Amino acid sequence: MIGGLTPLITFNGELGMRALLLAAGIGSRLRPLTNTTPKCLVPVHGRPLLDYWLDLVFEGGIERVLVNTHWLAPQVYDHVAKCRWAERIDLVHEETLLGTGGTVLANRPWFTNQRFLLAHADNLTDFDVAGFIRAHEGRPKGHAITMLGFRTDDPGSCGILELDQRNTVLAFHEKVPDPPGNLANGAVYIFEPEVMDVMASFGRPFVDLSTEVIPKFLGRILCFETSGYHRDIGTKESLQKAHSEFKQGSRGTLI
């Protein structure tokens, strides 16, 4: 049992990296669409965002996925139960949103004290998951996090990164008026177990990743820049752009 609920499918002993797909967002800026549709099930070219993610991570080498839910959770449960990856997915419901770090801590046993991938399932992306994992395995000594970076057309709305010559993240500027560049945090990470220890050190259930955890690891984060497509589907405008920019293929390719 995880988080007070029995998962859809229980862990059956696979070896390999696990992933947490954060899918509990309400999507208030996408209303009225999200009044009746969970944000993670908002469609692009007829496919829910969550389906793109599940194909992406499983085809990229992830062995098992945990999906958290909150708003309109029964729809997410029903959708996952019918998908082709159902036997490798666990679901956990949050009556009260815990924040990214809080969700990790609430389900800490599920990660089996191993490194894991974390992503926000309300983004649309087609990055190289296998390459991302390989980059983490070859990260500089002492680094505990690998972060996906992408080039944004709207730097003021993103967390902008400053890197050194090794692609180590030295500074992180969250939605500032005059950002120093356009390389943005893609909100996809691989964490070593020690990152969970830092989350736990706050001593409370709600922990924010961007403002509380990431700053503690500056100088120990490798940036993996994707050349593929990546967009936060947080507004009606961004959803419209995704429909015009992203062409559905096996997972999707940038036109």
Task: Please identify what each model-predicted range represents.
Residues T36-K39:
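Short alpha-helical oligomerization interface
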Residues L41, L91, I145, I221-C223, ...:
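Conserved beta-strand scaffold positions in the cores of enzyme catalytic domains, especially
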Residues P43, G149, E162, I190-E192:
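Short, well-ordered beta-strand micro-motif
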Residues R115-L117, L124, A130-R139, D153-P155, ...:
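Catalytic-core segments of class I nucleotidyltransferases/pyrophosphorylases
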Residues P140-F150:
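A short, conserved acidic/glycine-rich loop-to-beta-strand motif
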Residues E162-T168:
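Short acidic-glycine loop/turn motifs at beta-strand connectors
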